[in-house]
């Protein structure tokens, strides 16, 4: 039985808003529906949420579920990174579609930096991530997968996630199973874990799903099981 990635990784929306402007953006629709901020194209920082990181029960957190790291002001990033360093019990993920706008170094052991790739024409983002974000851990999310990305240079990448379009737009987009299998095969040849998101079940088949997490994430999940809530 496949698992939902949201059960493994919790959103912590420290920044809300994004300047990228994707036409299929679920975050923009949610912000508009729930009136989270006035203007989604003008990101806002909510430093009060940093206290969530102080909880001792380990968790895996995605910090860019409602934003893009490229839209964070440097001072926001510095404050968040400092808090991450103080809380090694957690693992933290960041995503961006504009790695070309980033340029920084970090030696954080529990921070994972990734790019979203939806089509072959966006493979440059992986190279830009490795060049512009000098970090310990990298990941790539191939979602929603609009076409066959072909041969991908995954050197230095520590995890990949593969998914398709969800919601109302899913009827307009068809992800071929061969695209997902090709990515999984390429990653496995390099020893990279692969996580197929639950929306691929109708395409791949539940019995064929690959749902692997990095060992650091698995350790967090194991400790969670033994932790008294």
Predicted regions: what they are:
Residues 67, 98-100, 117-119, 144-146, ...:
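Active-site-proximal loop/turn and secondary-structure-junction residues that shape catalytic pockets
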Residues 1-7, 146, 151-229:
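Auxiliary Fe-S-binding modules of radical SAM enzymes
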Residues 1-112, 120-134, 149-154:
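Conserved Radical SAM active-site core
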Residues 86-92, 134-137, 184-194:
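Structural alpha-beta junctions
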Residues 61-63, 92-94, 113-115, 138-142, ...:
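Hydrophobic faces of well-ordered beta-strands that scaffold small-molecule active sites
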Residues 79-82, 129-137, 174-186:
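Long, well-ordered alpha-helical scaffolding segments within enzyme catalytic domains
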Residues 118, 122, 173-176:
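Short capping loops/turns at secondary-structure boundaries
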């Amino acid at each position: 039985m496949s698992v939902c990635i949201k059960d493994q990784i919790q959103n912590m929306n420290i920044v809300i808003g994004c300047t990228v402007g994707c036409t299929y953006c679920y975050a923009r629709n949610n912000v508009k529906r729930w009136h989270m901020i006035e203007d989604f194209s003008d990101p806002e920082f909510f430093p009060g949420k940093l206290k969530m990181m102080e909880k001792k029960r380990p968790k895996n957190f995605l910090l860019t579920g409602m934003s893009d790291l490229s839209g964070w002001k440097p001072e926001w990033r510095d404050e968040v990174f400092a808090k991450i360093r103080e809380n090694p019990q957690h693992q933290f993920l960041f995503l961006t579609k504009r790695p070309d706008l980033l340029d920084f170094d970090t030696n954080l052991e529990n921070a994972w930096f990734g790019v979203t790739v939806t089509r072959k024409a966006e493979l440059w983002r992986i190279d830009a991530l490795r060049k512009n974000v000098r970090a310990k851990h990298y990941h790539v999310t191939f979602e929603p997968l609009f076409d066959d990305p072909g041969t991908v240079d995954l050197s230095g990448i520590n995890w990949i996630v593969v998914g398709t379009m969800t919601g109302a737009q899913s009827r307009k987009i068809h992800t071929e199973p061969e695209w997902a299998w090709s990515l999984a095969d390429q990653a496995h040849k390099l020893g990279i874990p692969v996580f197929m998101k639950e929306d691929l079940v109708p395409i791949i088949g539940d019995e064929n799903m690959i749902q692997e997490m990095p060992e650091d994430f698995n350790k967090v999940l194991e400790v969670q099981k033994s932790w008294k809530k």
